[in-house]
Amino acid sequence: MKRQTIFCLFGLLVATVVFWANACHCSAVIIIGSAAGNTGTPLDAGLASRWNQVGDWGSYLGTPIAPNYFLTAKHIGGAVGQSITFPDDNSSYQTVATFQDPNSDLALWQISGAFPSSRIVPMYAGNVVAGVPLTIFGRGLPRTNTVVTGANWPNGTEAKGWLWGTAASARSWGTNTLDGLGDGGAAGTQLAYDFDAAGGSNEGILSIGDSGGPVFIYQSGAWGLAGINYAVGPLAVRQTIDGPTLTAALYDYGGLYLETGSPVSWQLVSATMANKPAVSYSTFLSPRSDWIEAVITVPEPATLLLLTAAFLATPLLHRRAQVSRCRRCLPRSFTQFTHSHDPRPSVAESKSMPALHRQ
């Protein structure tokens, strides 16, 4: 994981696709070491506990943070009346209301009844610094063993990453190291971490379907919930300007062509001595702790009924995957993609990302 002070990012894709029914069981969080991924329970005892505490929300994940609430990503949607389930004992809890954060991509869901205390995951408290280790859970697409190649520096060609696989549903995990924080605009402050070829066999990157999964940071002897998976990019590349468009997990997109401009064109990203890895983003929870606390500590029955009725009046999720388009090089920024029920991609304004510094 490179801990560079400044990134030049080329846009990103919201890590979302709806798999609410009949998804096959494949690997999820993509890792360097194997196309099979880490689909078994982590060996670390604390992470093994978190593995069982996190529930399946459709074909995504949800994390209980209070007796009556679990947290996930807002953009994946859902419907009141659906249930979160826990594979370790097949327990299930029906949702009765949802609360969506107006200032981030977070959504809290209220359940009927209560989670046992053993299900509730503690929140990470405080700030973060570049270099802190992360553990990521998700249920996204796997990678394949098919290598993407591009121009090497100063000459020749070299491997750049792997093509994505197809269907996914099984949860898996990976590790990474925080590079810094990104300004996601309406999506909130984002934990940013890249896909480093030298990061070790468990080095992880998000893929479509990992949205809503948790990110943990070790604090005071326990793994605290620090983030909720949001996005990753760049993804769509070409090996030649007229070649097929590929979707890949990239530890170096230098020497490949990225989509840019309107009308669409493909631009070669110069190969350099240093790799240019894709970056994953997870919504950082600490800046939204006041909103979270306000929701989970004020269960007003009248307000609950109004919120439930309002949500049921909106269209339900069941939308097709949105496919990102990399619009242009945005130094020290990233492109925020809108979330609509229209399956065609749409791009919102670019939001400034501050320089990322070690502390």
Predicted regions and their residues:
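Cysteine-centered motifs
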Residues: C8, C24, C326-C329
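Chymotrypsin/trypsin-fold serine protease catalytic domain
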Residues: S112-I205, G209, N229-T247
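A short, hydrophobic C-terminal helix/tail in secreted or cell-surface proteins
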Residues: E300-H318
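C-terminal membrane-anchoring or membrane-association module
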Residues: P315-R332
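Bacterial N-terminal signal peptides
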Residues: F10-W20
